């Protein structure tokens, strides 16, 4: 697949087809090509001998997509930076990346060591350079970086994950084929562009001549606006975290009647709970549900499985799928040997989807990446096992805690808690006393119940948990809330929860 050429062909074949919609703003494939060409021409004329990455700042504005393509057409990787990212972190990204330029689609942070092109300046560039086309020889290709996404680092400093053109082509081609994506579909874009889940909809949509329907953080905070937008969208391909879908399922009208042409649900970024998938099948009986797995360092996702009722009945904890054909999975034991089928260990991903490492961080790169049989490999830090070719994810190795001498996985407890009657959503928060964990707190969004007192509801939930888990894994305390806080990326905001419950 020639990625950029594939996107550009729609500007010729279906120039008036809408490529991207956000609120009242939208762009066609013709406009996407013209404006990204103009921007690429300007970048190449301003930085003829430079290939440093370019920061792209904003939220869900159509200019974000134009800027991404303009950067790569001019031979520069782009770094998506969302409005929600604090100024201090933006500063550290600018310093670590060596970027010399920031393209802004919104009000911009100031005092950065880069040249800033404002939203108005961008529009001037689109106008004054219209009709100019960049030299296709300058475009990003092969093992050159296409985008760099910054993720959280254990040191407190963000890590820039370098994804090459070849990495992205490998992912996009697999996604289009394995998920049976068709020409001209409408894709939900829920994840901010600084979260690599957004790549799961951006490029599969653009290469198939689809329409990206973006919903922003303000809509998500106002369910009335969110569901009004969804009703207008006619979305056919849904891409989100499971947490976001779980939140939508709390609205009774979120069903086939709201989205009658829904064809495919694509989930990544978190564990897909069995009960969430089951509710989706009930609400959208004609749609296909795909559960996928992959870290940012391996280009969005490397495994997938069609979740059917048979799969739901067979597995209480859902498998995350079969590996894409050009990659392979190894399960490594603590002693460095490969675990046999069915035995747990660390998931290691090998193949062309794997990143070339962290930008400007050779020590971190050496720790997480290696070469196996001449191919790049990434040590994920995730626990899991493979059985009959199917990968089962068992949580982060660093989500395992030791409580009163017992080692346990928090996600396992959450899985069983969510399966209880009277529970709509739940997160386990381990509470420390000094340096050690003292007890487990369950933060629960209750479902329908007739208990007059909270302690009676707690007793009923604990009774069910006692049938599923050993006593030492039962949370000592329960807290009830109307919702679980989420990060801008659509994942459970564990840090915020911890600060709330320990305040």
Curated annotation (Swiss-Prot):
Catalytic activity: holo-[D-alanyl-carrier protein] + D-alanine + ATP = D-alanyl-[D-alanyl-carrier protein] + AMP + diphosphate
Source species, domain of life: Bacteria
Binding site for D-alanine: 196, 300, 491
Ribonucleoprotein among keywords: no
Entry EC no(s): 6.2.1.54
Keywords: ATP-binding, Cytoplasm, Ligase, Nucleotide-binding
Primary enzyme class: ligase
One Gene Ontology MF term: D-alanine [D-alanyl carrier protein] ligase activity
CDD domains (alphabetical): DltA (cd05945)
Gene Ontology process terms (BP): lipoteichoic acid biosynthetic process
Intracellular or extracellular location(s): Cytoplasm
GO cellular component terms listed in the entry, alphabetical order: cytoplasm
Pathway: Cell wall biogenesis; lipoteichoic acid biosynthesis
Binding site for ATP: 151-152, 291-296, 382, 393-396, 491
InterPro entries linked to this entry: AA_adenyl_dom, AMP-bd_C, AMP-bd_C_sf, AMP-binding_CS, AMP-dep_synth/lig_dom, ANL_N_sf, DltA, DltA-like
PANTHER family per UniProt: ENZYME, PUTATIVE (JCVI)-RELATED, PTHR45398
Function of the protein: Catalyzes the first step in the D-alanylation of lipoteichoic acid (LTA), the activation of D-alanine and its transfer onto the D-alanyl carrier protein (Dcp) DltC. In an ATP-dependent two-step reaction, forms a high energy D-alanyl-AMP intermediate, followed by transfer of the D-alanyl residue as a thiol ester to the phosphopantheinyl prosthetic group of the Dcp. D-alanylation of LTA plays an important role in modulating the properties of the cell wall in Gram-positive bacteria, influencing the net charge of the cell wall.
Protein family membership: Belongs to the ATP-dependent AMP-binding enzyme family. DltA subfamily.
The protein's name in its UniProt record: D-alanine--D-alanyl carrier protein ligase
